[in-house]
Amino acid sequence: MLELGVKHLYIEDRYSYDIEINDAIKDSTRRTGKKIVTNTFDRIKNGFIDLNTKDLKNVVEDITDELVLNEDVLLNLVSLKSTSDYTYEHSVNVSVVCIALGKMLGYSKSELYKLGMGGMLHDIGKTLIPEEILNKPAKLTDHEFEIIKNHPELGFNYLQQIESISPLSRIVVYSHHERVDGSGYPRGLKGDEIHEFARVAAIADVFDALTSDRVYRDRWPTYKAAEYIMNHTEQLFDYQLVKKFLPQVSFYPNGSEVILSSGHRAVVRTQNVGFPTRPVLRLIEDDEGNELDKELDLLKHMNIVITKVIV
Protein backbone atom coordinates (compact mmCIF):
# COMPACT_ATOMS: atom_id res chain seq x y z
CA MET A 1 0.00 0.00 0.00
CA LEU A 2 2.80 2.39 0.88
CA GLU A 3 4.48 1.73 -2.47
CA LEU A 4 1.25 2.82 -4.18
CA GLY A 5 1.29 6.07 -2.24
CA VAL A 6 -1.53 5.03 0.13
CA LYS A 7 -0.52 6.14 3.62
CA HIS A 8 -3.94 6.28 5.30
CA LEU A 9 -7.12 4.22 5.33
CA TYR A 10 -10.67 5.08 6.37
CA ILE A 11 -12.20 2.50 8.71
CA GLU A 12 -15.92 1.84 8.34
CA ASP A 13 -18.16 0.85 11.24
CA ARG A 14 -21.92 0.34 11.54
CA TYR A 15 -22.45 4.09 11.69
CA SER A 16 -20.27 5.04 8.73
CA TYR A 17 -20.53 2.09 6.33
CA ASP A 18 -22.53 4.04 3.72
CA ILE A 19 -20.94 7.47 4.22
CA GLU A 20 -18.96 8.68 1.23
CA ILE A 21 -15.82 10.71 1.96
CA ASN A 22 -15.97 12.82 -1.18
CA ASP A 23 -13.02 14.71 -2.58
CA ALA A 24 -13.20 17.49 -5.14
CA ILE A 25 -10.77 15.56 -7.38
CA LYS A 26 -9.87 11.90 -7.91
CA ASP A 27 -7.44 10.25 -5.49
CA SER A 28 -5.24 9.27 -8.43
CA THR A 29 -5.06 12.88 -9.62
CA ARG A 30 -4.18 14.06 -6.12
CA ARG A 31 -1.42 11.44 -5.76
CA THR A 32 -0.03 12.33 -9.19
CA GLY A 33 -0.03 16.03 -8.32
CA LYS A 34 1.75 15.43 -5.05
CA LYS A 35 4.36 13.23 -6.75
CA ILE A 36 5.05 15.81 -9.45
CA VAL A 37 5.32 18.68 -6.96
CA THR A 38 7.63 16.59 -4.77
CA ASN A 39 9.92 15.78 -7.68
CA THR A 40 9.86 19.38 -8.92
CA PHE A 41 10.66 20.93 -5.56
CA ASP A 42 13.32 18.33 -4.75
CA ARG A 43 15.11 19.03 -8.03
CA ILE A 44 15.24 22.74 -7.22
CA LYS A 45 16.55 21.99 -3.72
CA ASN A 46 19.30 19.91 -5.32
CA GLY A 47 20.41 22.77 -7.55
CA PHE A 48 18.73 21.93 -10.86
CA ILE A 49 17.51 25.04 -12.67
CA ASP A 50 15.14 23.35 -15.14
CA LEU A 51 11.48 22.69 -14.41
CA ASN A 52 9.43 19.79 -15.79
CA THR A 53 6.60 22.01 -16.92
CA LYS A 54 5.03 19.27 -19.07
CA ASP A 55 4.12 17.11 -16.07
CA LEU A 56 2.97 20.14 -14.09
CA LYS A 57 0.85 21.31 -17.04
CA ASN A 58 -0.77 17.89 -17.41
CA VAL A 59 -1.77 17.52 -13.76
CA VAL A 60 -3.09 21.10 -13.45
CA GLU A 61 -5.13 20.53 -16.62
CA ASP A 62 -6.49 17.30 -15.12
CA ILE A 63 -7.48 19.08 -11.89
CA THR A 64 -9.11 21.86 -13.90
CA ASP A 65 -11.05 19.39 -16.06
CA GLU A 66 -12.31 17.45 -13.04
CA LEU A 67 -13.46 20.55 -11.19
CA VAL A 68 -15.14 22.03 -14.27
CA LEU A 69 -17.11 18.80 -14.78
CA ASN A 70 -18.03 18.51 -11.08
CA GLU A 71 -21.37 20.34 -10.83
CA ASP A 72 -21.51 20.53 -7.03
CA VAL A 73 -17.96 21.03 -5.84
CA LEU A 74 -17.74 20.90 -2.05
CA LEU A 75 -14.25 21.33 -0.71
CA ASN A 76 -13.48 18.59 1.78
CA LEU A 77 -9.75 19.14 2.22
CA VAL A 78 -9.51 17.96 5.80
CA SER A 79 -8.84 14.38 4.89
CA LEU A 80 -5.82 12.71 6.43
CA LYS A 81 -2.69 14.77 5.80
CA SER A 82 0.92 14.10 6.65
CA THR A 83 2.96 16.69 8.54
CA SER A 84 6.17 15.59 6.81
CA ASP A 85 4.61 15.99 3.36
CA TYR A 86 2.87 19.27 4.18
CA THR A 87 4.50 21.46 1.51
CA TYR A 88 3.60 19.07 -1.32
CA GLU A 89 0.05 18.27 -0.19
CA HIS A 90 -0.53 21.95 0.53
CA SER A 91 0.54 22.88 -3.00
CA VAL A 92 -2.03 20.52 -4.54
CA ASN A 93 -4.77 21.65 -2.15
CA VAL A 94 -4.16 25.33 -2.84
CA SER A 95 -4.35 24.63 -6.56
CA VAL A 96 -7.67 22.80 -6.09
CA VAL A 97 -9.19 25.57 -3.95
CA CYS A 98 -8.00 28.27 -6.36
CA ILE A 99 -9.56 26.54 -9.34
CA ALA A 100 -12.80 25.79 -7.48
CA LEU A 101 -13.16 29.41 -6.40
CA GLY A 102 -12.18 30.64 -9.85
CA LYS A 103 -14.95 28.48 -11.31
CA MET A 104 -17.47 30.18 -8.99
CA LEU A 105 -16.17 33.54 -10.23
CA GLY A 106 -16.87 32.58 -13.84
CA TYR A 107 -13.26 32.33 -15.02
CA SER A 108 -12.57 30.79 -18.42
CA LYS A 109 -10.86 27.41 -18.57
CA SER A 110 -7.63 29.11 -19.63
CA GLU A 111 -7.83 31.44 -16.62
CA LEU A 112 -8.57 28.53 -14.30
CA TYR A 113 -5.49 26.71 -15.56
CA LYS A 114 -3.22 29.73 -15.02
CA LEU A 115 -4.68 30.31 -11.56
CA GLY A 116 -4.30 26.62 -10.71
CA MET A 117 -0.69 26.58 -11.88
CA GLY A 118 0.00 29.59 -9.67
CA GLY A 119 -1.59 27.77 -6.75
CA MET A 120 0.47 24.65 -7.42
CA LEU A 121 3.71 26.65 -7.46
CA HIS A 122 2.86 29.36 -4.92
CA ASP A 123 5.38 28.08 -2.37
CA ILE A 124 8.13 27.15 -4.82
CA GLY A 125 10.34 29.83 -3.29
CA LYS A 126 10.42 27.83 -0.04
CA THR A 127 12.70 25.34 -1.79
CA LEU A 128 15.35 28.06 -1.55
CA ILE A 129 14.84 28.59 2.21
CA PRO A 130 16.92 26.51 4.70
CA GLU A 131 14.90 23.50 5.87
CA GLU A 132 15.91 24.02 9.49
CA ILE A 133 13.93 27.27 9.38
CA LEU A 134 10.99 25.87 7.39
CA ASN A 135 10.57 22.87 9.70
CA LYS A 136 11.46 24.54 12.99
CA PRO A 137 9.00 23.26 15.65
CA ALA A 138 9.46 26.31 17.88
CA LYS A 139 8.50 29.92 17.25
CA LEU A 140 10.63 31.62 14.59
CA THR A 141 12.90 34.47 15.57
CA ASP A 142 12.29 37.83 13.91
CA HIS A 143 15.33 37.20 11.70
CA GLU A 144 14.09 33.74 10.68
CA PHE A 145 10.64 35.11 9.85
CA GLU A 146 12.21 37.77 7.64
CA ILE A 147 13.99 34.97 5.77
CA ILE A 148 10.69 33.08 5.35
CA LYS A 149 9.07 36.25 4.00
CA ASN A 150 11.53 36.18 1.10
CA HIS A 151 9.93 33.09 -0.43
CA PRO A 152 7.36 34.85 -2.68
CA GLU A 153 10.05 36.96 -4.33
CA LEU A 154 12.48 34.03 -4.54
CA GLY A 155 9.82 31.92 -6.25
CA PHE A 156 8.80 34.72 -8.59
CA ASN A 157 12.40 35.39 -9.62
CA TYR A 158 13.00 31.68 -10.22
CA LEU A 159 9.92 31.40 -12.46
CA GLN A 160 10.86 34.53 -14.42
CA GLN A 161 13.39 32.41 -16.31
CA ILE A 162 10.76 29.84 -17.35
CA GLU A 163 8.80 31.20 -20.31
CA SER A 164 6.17 28.44 -20.28
CA ILE A 165 4.85 29.64 -16.90
CA SER A 166 2.26 32.38 -17.48
CA PRO A 167 2.83 35.84 -15.96
CA LEU A 168 -0.57 35.38 -14.27
CA SER A 169 0.70 32.23 -12.56
CA ARG A 170 3.84 34.06 -11.50
CA ILE A 171 1.83 36.89 -9.95
CA VAL A 172 0.10 34.33 -7.71
CA VAL A 173 3.52 33.17 -6.53
CA TYR A 174 4.67 36.75 -5.96
CA SER A 175 1.57 38.16 -4.26
CA HIS A 176 -0.23 35.37 -2.36
CA HIS A 177 0.89 36.87 0.98
CA GLU A 178 -0.44 40.35 0.19
CA ARG A 179 -3.46 41.37 2.29
CA VAL A 180 -6.27 43.77 1.39
CA ASP A 181 -5.46 46.13 4.29
CA GLY A 182 -1.83 46.48 3.17
CA SER A 183 -0.39 44.41 6.02
CA GLY A 184 0.96 41.67 3.74
CA TYR A 185 4.25 41.17 1.93
CA PRO A 186 6.45 41.54 -0.07
CA ARG A 187 5.10 44.90 -1.32
CA GLY A 188 2.37 45.84 1.15
CA LEU A 189 -0.24 46.22 -1.59
CA LYS A 190 -3.84 47.11 -0.71
CA GLY A 191 -7.25 46.12 -2.08
CA ASP A 192 -7.47 46.18 -5.86
CA GLU A 193 -3.73 46.84 -6.10
CA ILE A 194 -3.49 43.09 -5.51
CA HIS A 195 -4.34 41.03 -8.59
CA GLU A 196 -7.58 39.08 -8.10
CA PHE A 197 -5.75 35.79 -8.73
CA ALA A 198 -3.50 36.56 -5.76
CA ARG A 199 -6.49 37.51 -3.59
CA VAL A 200 -8.04 34.15 -4.44
CA ALA A 201 -4.78 32.36 -3.62
CA ALA A 202 -4.52 34.17 -0.27
CA ILE A 203 -7.80 32.61 0.86
CA ALA A 204 -6.85 29.17 -0.45
CA ASP A 205 -3.39 29.29 1.14
CA VAL A 206 -4.57 30.33 4.61
CA PHE A 207 -7.57 28.01 4.67
CA ASP A 208 -5.55 24.92 3.81
CA ALA A 209 -2.69 25.89 6.13
CA LEU A 210 -5.07 26.27 9.07
CA THR A 211 -6.70 22.88 8.43
CA SER A 212 -3.35 21.06 8.19
CA ASP A 213 -1.15 19.65 10.94
CA ARG A 214 2.10 21.59 11.23
CA VAL A 215 5.30 20.87 13.13
CA TYR A 216 4.39 23.63 15.60
CA ARG A 217 0.59 23.10 15.99
CA ASP A 218 -2.31 20.76 15.32
CA ARG A 219 -4.79 21.40 12.53
CA TRP A 220 -7.87 23.50 13.09
CA PRO A 221 -11.36 22.06 12.47
CA THR A 222 -12.83 23.23 9.18
CA TYR A 223 -15.52 25.36 10.83
CA LYS A 224 -12.91 27.18 12.93
CA ALA A 225 -10.77 27.92 9.86
CA ALA A 226 -13.88 29.17 8.04
CA GLU A 227 -14.69 31.43 11.00
CA TYR A 228 -11.15 32.82 10.88
CA ILE A 229 -11.56 33.65 7.19
CA MET A 230 -14.96 35.28 7.89
CA ASN A 231 -13.68 37.26 10.87
CA HIS A 232 -10.77 38.69 8.86
CA THR A 233 -12.75 39.65 5.77
CA GLU A 234 -11.96 43.20 4.59
CA GLN A 235 -8.92 43.19 6.87
CA LEU A 236 -6.95 40.37 5.28
CA PHE A 237 -9.25 38.88 2.65
CA ASP A 238 -11.47 40.20 -0.14
CA TYR A 239 -15.10 40.28 1.03
CA GLN A 240 -16.63 39.42 -2.35
CA LEU A 241 -14.31 36.44 -2.79
CA VAL A 242 -15.00 35.14 0.73
CA LYS A 243 -18.76 35.28 -0.03
CA LYS A 244 -18.15 32.99 -3.02
CA PHE A 245 -15.71 30.73 -1.17
CA LEU A 246 -17.51 29.80 2.06
CA PRO A 247 -20.57 28.07 0.51
CA GLN A 248 -18.15 25.66 -1.21
CA VAL A 249 -16.58 24.48 2.05
CA SER A 250 -17.71 21.43 4.01
CA PHE A 251 -17.63 23.02 7.47
CA TYR A 252 -18.32 19.59 8.96
CA PRO A 253 -16.86 17.02 6.52
CA ASN A 254 -18.61 13.71 5.92
CA GLY A 255 -17.69 11.21 8.61
CA SER A 256 -17.13 13.86 11.30
CA GLU A 257 -18.49 12.96 14.74
CA VAL A 258 -20.33 15.85 16.39
CA ILE A 259 -22.34 16.83 19.46
CA LEU A 260 -25.63 18.71 19.00
CA SER A 261 -27.32 21.38 21.10
CA SER A 262 -29.96 18.73 21.87
CA GLY A 263 -27.29 16.60 23.53
CA HIS A 264 -27.33 13.96 20.79
CA ARG A 265 -24.15 12.50 19.34
CA ALA A 266 -24.11 12.14 15.56
CA VAL A 267 -22.01 11.44 12.48
CA VAL A 268 -22.13 13.72 9.44
CA ARG A 269 -23.65 11.66 6.63
CA THR A 270 -23.83 14.09 3.70
CA GLN A 271 -23.89 17.80 2.85
CA ASN A 272 -26.63 20.26 1.91
CA VAL A 273 -24.98 22.18 -0.93
CA GLY A 274 -24.98 25.91 -0.24
CA PHE A 275 -25.65 25.44 3.49
CA PRO A 276 -22.27 24.43 4.94
CA THR A 277 -23.40 24.62 8.59
CA ARG A 278 -26.51 22.44 8.06
CA PRO A 279 -25.43 18.93 6.98
CA VAL A 280 -27.48 15.73 7.12
CA LEU A 281 -26.56 13.67 10.19
CA ARG A 282 -26.91 10.13 11.46
CA LEU A 283 -27.87 10.23 15.13
CA ILE A 284 -25.96 7.53 17.03
CA GLU A 285 -26.66 8.37 20.68
CA ASP A 286 -29.21 10.45 22.58
CA ASP A 287 -28.54 12.80 25.48
CA GLU A 288 -28.84 9.89 27.95
CA GLY A 289 -26.36 7.66 26.12
CA ASN A 290 -28.92 5.38 24.48
CA GLU A 291 -27.89 4.09 21.04
CA LEU A 292 -29.74 5.40 18.00
CA ASP A 293 -29.64 4.95 14.23
CA LYS A 294 -31.74 7.77 12.85
CA GLU A 295 -31.26 10.45 10.18
CA LEU A 296 -31.54 14.14 11.01
CA ASP A 297 -31.40 16.88 8.36
CA LEU A 298 -30.28 20.07 10.09
CA LEU A 299 -31.72 22.12 7.24
CA LYS A 300 -35.16 20.93 8.36
CA HIS A 301 -34.46 21.43 12.07
CA MET A 302 -33.17 24.98 12.37
CA ASN A 303 -33.54 24.95 16.18
CA ILE A 304 -30.71 22.41 16.48
CA VAL A 305 -27.06 23.32 15.95
CA ILE A 306 -23.72 21.56 16.12
CA THR A 307 -21.95 22.60 19.32
CA LYS A 308 -18.81 20.45 19.22
CA VAL A 309 -16.75 18.39 16.80
CA ILE A 310 -15.32 15.25 18.41
CA VAL A 311 -13.29 14.00 15.47
Residue ranges and their predicted role:
Residues 35-311:
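Histidine- and acidic-residue-rich, metal-dependent catalytic cores
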Residues 2-44, 51, 56-59, 67:
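Transcription initiation cofactors for RNA polymerase, centered on bacterial
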